[in-house]
């Protein structure tokens, strides 16, 4: 199961090529890669905070008993200036709930943001630096937890980063926050390569 907010739902900002902002969830691309061995379900709610994800976790995830649950959340919390430690407490609760039920959690880090020309102003640079720092703090906690539990995790932040500017690469986002089809395909490709291609996915349960 793929569980999270708009980045799991596959939201895209409307463009000339995609005027309706059609959803392209990475879970659909992951299903194509995995094939018919297992069913990949997607549960993403746009605008959702990690506390709301915790509330949904039991009836949505635990009720289905998937073999794995990919958990991507925290971007909206950061947008509301929630502290990384508080966000991590919610993510940790979901990781631990999954493990207690024999479900393998797959933690995913939150991506950077793209502010473009706003970096030309001192105020814009300060805003970006603050947001980048909190993202790094949260992602460090996510990856540290995964390492401590010997869990496979996907570093979406690093995978979609523009190294020179430390912003979300423009080829992966057209609004500075959500991903493009290329970005969502990247998540699926990397999850398949780094997590699911290594696992035995022959059980009749869903992912």
Give the residues covered by each predicted segment.
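Serine-esterase "nucleophile elbow" of acetyl-processing enzymes
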Residues: 1-46, 56-65
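Alpha-helical cap/lid subdomain in secreted, periplasmic
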Residues: 29-36, 52-207
């Amino acid at each position: 199961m793929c569980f999270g907010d708009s980045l799991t739902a596959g939201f895209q900002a409307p463009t000339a090529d995609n005027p309706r902002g059609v959803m392209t969830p990475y879970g659909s691309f992951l299903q194509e890669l995995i094939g018919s061995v297992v069913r990949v379900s997607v549960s993403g709610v746009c605008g959702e905070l990690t506390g709301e994800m915790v509330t949904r976790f039991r009836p949505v995830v635990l009720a289905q008993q998937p073999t794995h649950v990919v958990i991507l959340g925290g971007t909206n919390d950061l947008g509301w200036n929630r502290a990384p430690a508080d966000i991590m407490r919610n993510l940790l609760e979901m990781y631990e709930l999954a493990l207690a039920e024999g479900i393998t959690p797959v933690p995913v880090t939150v991506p950077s943001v793209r502010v473009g020309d706003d970096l030309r102003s001192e105020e814009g640079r300060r805003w970006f630096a603050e947001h980048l720092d909190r993202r790094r703090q949260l992602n460090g906690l996510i990856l540290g937890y995964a390492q401590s539990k010997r869990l496979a995790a996907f570093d979406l932040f690093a995978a979609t980063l523009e190294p020179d500017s430390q912003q979300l690469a423009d080829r992966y986002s057209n609004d500075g926050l959500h991903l493009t089809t290329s970005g969502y395909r990247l998540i699926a490709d990397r999850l398949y390569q780094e997590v699911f291609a290594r696992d035995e996915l022959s059980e009749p349960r869903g992912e």
